[in-house]
Amino acid sequence: MKKPKVTTQKPKLTYRVNEQIRVPEVRVIFTDGTQKVMPTLEARRMAEERNQDLIEVQPNAAPPVCKFDNLGKLLYKMDKRDKDLKKKQKATTLKELRFHPNTDKHDFDFKTAHLEEFLRKGNRVRATIVFLGRSIIYKDKGLELAERLTERLSIVSNRDGDPKFEGKKLFVYFDPDKKKIDTYERIKAKTSQPFVPLAPLSPEDLIEEPELESESDSDAEPESDN
């Protein structure tokens, strides 16, 4: 399976600068924390005298709030911030296995063991309970199965929300929990049971969807060098 493609774009400044600021007056915040409302033309002149740019940081304020900064350095910092965020992103795969409300114990144990393994490897998983034909009248059995899955997978994961019906399918999502996984691995390492690999899933049983997970995301306003 191909890895999800991460596109790299140049930082886009969404704030107006210099001549783009066309309101009659602005509130300028200085590096020492003081602020002053002044005509925009005067603020632009002050920026030029400092060899800096007048940058609007709060366009919806009345009047808009601006600061003095170096536009080139600001764009560089924004680019660096975007690259740092991309480094913290990691490609993961949503793994889905399908069940039926009358799934037998052997099939349940087999598929749940695979879901557990996917979670231990850091993947998000989705258990889909499919109601064929008139079996949709047995919704309670599907919900029962969802609770059994939740209990079994709770040692390595947290359920993401409540089970959700969409048509004749019941979806249950689980997110890996690193602390639980670490504890589980430590306990398992202390046992003397030999490692037995799971039998492979049949291709029609497993559905995979690429996802991009970010460890940190923020929409910070332009930073100041000062």
Curated annotation (Swiss-Prot):
It holds the Pfam family IF3_C. Residues 195-226 are annotated as: Disordered. It comes from the Bacteria. It is found in: Cytoplasm. GO terms for molecular function: ribosome binding; translation initiation factor activity. Disulfide bonds: none annotated. Its main location: cytoplasm. Keywords: Cytoplasm, Initiation factor, Protein biosynthesis. The keyword rRNA processing does not apply. The keyword Isomerase does not apply. One of its GO terms (cellular component) is cytosol. GO terms for biological process: ribosome disassembly. Residues 205-226 have a biased composition (Acidic residues). NCBIfam families: infC. PANTHER family: TRANSLATION INITIATION FACTOR IF-3 (PTHR10938), TRANSLATION INITIATION FACTOR IF-3, MITOCHONDRIAL (PTHR10938:SF0). Monomer. IF-3 binds to the 30S ribosomal subunit and shifts the equilibrium between 70S ribosomes and their 50S and 30S subunits in favor of the free subunits, thus enhancing the availability of 30S subunits on which protein synthesis initiation begins. HAMAP family: IF_3 (MF_00080). Belongs to the IF-3 family. This is Translation initiation factor IF-3. The gene is infC.
